[in-house]
Structure formats: structure tokens, C-alpha cells
A protein has these predicted regions:
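Iron-sulfur (Fe-S) cluster-binding modules
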Residues: 1-11
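N-terminal pre-triad scaffold of radical SAM enzymes
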Residues: 14-68, 85-94
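Short, conserved beta-strand segments within well-ordered enzyme catalytic domains
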Residues: 31-33, 79, 138, 166
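Short, surface-exposed acidic/glycine-rich loop or hinge patches that mediate macromolecular interfaces
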Residues: 35, 63, 92, 113, ...
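Iron-sulfur cluster-binding cysteine motifs and their immediate structural context
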Residues: 42-49, 68-87, 97-113
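Extended, non-globular alpha-helical segments
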Residues: 58-64, 111-126
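Conserved AdoMet/S-adenosylmethionine-binding subsite of the radical SAM
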Residues: 117-218
Length: 218
């Protein structure tokens, strides 16, 4: 049992848990997409994962302005202006009534708050597939290290269950966190966005020196 880091019941914001994945490490894997990222890459494949907390996403090019979302919102947090809904996101309680009633799937709630125990229950469902294929669990994002305490809890529990672990990172992480997590990670998927220091800072907000320091340490 790994006990260098205290395990506690954390809640994590996740975008998705993808089972039977084949492209995020060896073998058959389950990928946990964590919410939150310190970068703002204009080419991001999962821009909805950049915010850490669950949030409402309106896909305007799908919206037909039918007004059903306004009618269903009992709190009056949606109003129709210029044929399209305007959302009071700060007052939204994420009841998801507007998401369910939208005929065009133009409203989507991104992110879910879930405990580490609930995540582990899902991960362990496919243990036999991991073992037979040389697979395991991959933590992605967003940036997995953004939710460090929750990530550490999950990594420890995975290693206690003898699961292969992989973490996908952009490298914009405090080195101390890398040092703590390294013994628990079997494989790093290190995504360097650009090698031009100034362009990297301008386009993504990342610091190349920090990223390369972490890469060298690993």
C-alpha cells in the first residue's frame, strides 16, 4: 500500500470519463478528463474543459430561438433577446431543465462534480480489460494537475489496486507537484505546445522555462 500521501475523499470536477479508449496510452484504458487548465490555447480540442467548475455552454449556431428554455426556467435566469437566449450564469443552479428541453441540443452543461470514490468505482469496472491488454487509467483534461489533491488521491488508489497510470500534461505545473506525483505515474504524455518562448507565452499564456524544467526532471 502506498501511504506517502494522505488519501481523503475529494470532489473533482470532471468533463467526461471515457471507457475503452485506445489512444491515450498502451492497451485498453479508461480516460478521466478533469476540468480546469492554466492555458488558453486557441487551437484547444476541448475548450469547454478550460474552466474548472461545471458551467453552462450555449452553442449558438445550433439554436433556433424557440424560447423553450426561457419558458422552462422557473428561476427566470433565461431571457430571449434578439431571438436568442441570454443566460444569467451566476444565478444558475444547474438543474439542467433547459438542457433537457432544447430540441436542438444547443444547451449543454459541461462538467460534473463527483467524488474520488465514485470515480474509482467506474475505473475498477474494467480491471480485467486493463490486465489482459496491458492497459490502465489515463488522467487528462484540461490539465490534470489543476486538481492536484484529487489527482493524487486517485493515483494512490490506482496504484493500491495495481492499475497502470498515465497522466497527460501541458507541463505548466509547479515542480513540487511533479515531484510528489512522479512515483505514482507509470507514463507521462507530455504535450509541449510550442518551442518558441515568446510565441508560446503570447498564444497560450504558458512559460517555456517552467515546462522544460519539469520535462528535464521527469
Amino acid at each position: 500500500m502506498i501511504n506517502k500521501y494522505k488519501v481523503s475523499e475529494n470532489r473533482l470536477s470532471i468533463m467526461e470519463i471515457e471507457r475503452f479508449a485506445f489512444h491515450d496510452g498502451p492497451g485498453i484504458r479508461t480516460v478521466v478528463f478533469l476540468q480546469g487548465c492554466p492555458l488558453h490555447c486557441p487551437w484547444c480540442s476541448n475548450p469547454e474543459s478550460q474552466k474548472r467548475k461545471p458551467h453552462l455552454l450555449h452553442i449558438k449556431n445550433k439554436c433556433i430561438g424557440c424560447g423553450r428554455c426561457e419558458a422552462i426556467c422557473t428561476r427566470g435566469n433565461i431571457s430571449i433577446q434578439d431571438h436568442f437566449p441570454v443566460f444569467n450564469r451566476q444565478a444558475c443552479v444547474a438543474c439542467k431543465a433547459c438542457e433537457r428541453i432544447c430540441p436542438q441540443n444547443a444547451i449543454k452543461f459541461v462538467g460534473e462534480s463527483i467524488t474520488s470514490s465514485e470515480i474509482m468505482e467506474i475505473l475498477l469496472r474494467d480491471r480485467d480489460y486493463y490486465l489482459n491488454s496491458g492497459g490502465g487509467v489515463t488522467f487528462s483534461g484540461g490539465e490534470a494537475f489543476t486538481q492536484f489533491e484529487g489527482l493524487m488521491d486517485l493515483l494512490i488508489q490506482c496504484k493500491n489496486e495495481k492499475l497502470h497510470t498515465s497522466v497527460e500534461t501541458c507541463g505548466q505545473v509547479n515542480l513540487d507537484k511533479i515531484k510528489q506525483a512522479l512515483p505514482l505515474i507509470d507514463l507521462f504524455l507530455f504535450d509541449i505546445k510550442h518551442t518558441d518562448k515568446d510565441l508560446l507565452q503570447k498564444e497560450t499564456g504558458a512559460n517555456l522555462d517552467t515546462i522544460l524544467t519539469n520535462l528535464r526532471y521527469i
